A protein has these predicted regions:
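Glycine-rich phosphate-binding P-loop
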Residues: 6-22
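ATP-dependent small-molecule kinase phosphotransfer cores
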Residues: 33-88, 94
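Post-Walker A helix-loop "phosphate-sensing" segment adjacent to the P-loop in P-loop NTPases
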Residues: 24-32
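ATP-dependent NMP and nucleoside kinases share a basic, alpha-helical "lid"
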Residues: 82-125
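Short, acidic/turn-prone active-site loops that include or flank metal/cofactor-
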Residues: 11-13, 33-39, 114-121, 141
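Short, hydrophobic/glycine-enriched beta-strand segments
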Residues: 3-11, 30-31, 170
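Small-molecule kinase domains that catalyze NTP-dependent phosphoryl transfer to phosphate-bearing small molecules
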Residues: 78, 113-170
Length: 170
């Protein structure tokens, strides 16, 4: 059974890049973000085409956060489960109740905080590094970030499905 990994952190820190790297180079399936899982519901709420909702999500961060909180009111893991149905690695959890419920239900083998000193504190994330069981720092080049991700993945699970690129980074 594949490992389940959640990457969290402030907006634009490199969470999606981490998920995409593990999918492309480490043999895991990337399920996208919880925002992606919420997209059809958000587009319906906003009464716009999903493409318009997605393209404007960063301009509407607080609205997305508040409506996604409403969507999760009765089931904190609702969006997490939707994303996990698409893959083993997901990103984008922003609420403390989500993290706590996911831990209680043992939905993930690893919850990794992506720390990036180049991005500002994100007010839509209401928990911190202390809720995670690992950290990866994204502060250099893309190749340096990939190296850290490959090393983390090799430590967390087998490297038998790694691409030649990921193996070279070890």
């Amino acid at each position: 059974m594949a490992k389940k990994i959640l990457f969290v952190g402030f907006g634009r820190s490199g969470k999606d890049t981490a998920g995409e790297f593990l999918a492309e180079h480490c043999g895991l399936r990337y399920g996208g973000s919880t925002s992606w899982a919420a997209l059809p519901l958000m587009a319906e709420f906003l009464k716009v085409h999903p493409m318009v909702a997605w393209e404007n999500r960063h301009k509407n961060r607080e609205l997305w956060k508040s409506h996604c909180d409403e969507l999760r009111k009765d089931d904190p893991c609702r969006l997490i489960r939707l994303a996990l149905a698409q893959g083993d690695v997901i990103t984008g959890v922003r609420g403390l109740p989500e993290i706590q419920a996911a831990r209680k239900e043992s939905l993930f083998d690893h919850i990794i905080w992506v720390a990036n000193p180049r991005v500002p504190v994100d007010p839509t994330v209401d928990f911190g590094i202390d809720e995670c069981n690992g950290v990866v720092v994204n502060e250099g080049t893309l190749e340096e970030y990939h190296r850290k991700l490959a090393q983390m993945a090799a430590f967390a699970f087998s490297a038998e499905n790694f691409s030649p690129y990921a193996l070279k980074l070890l």
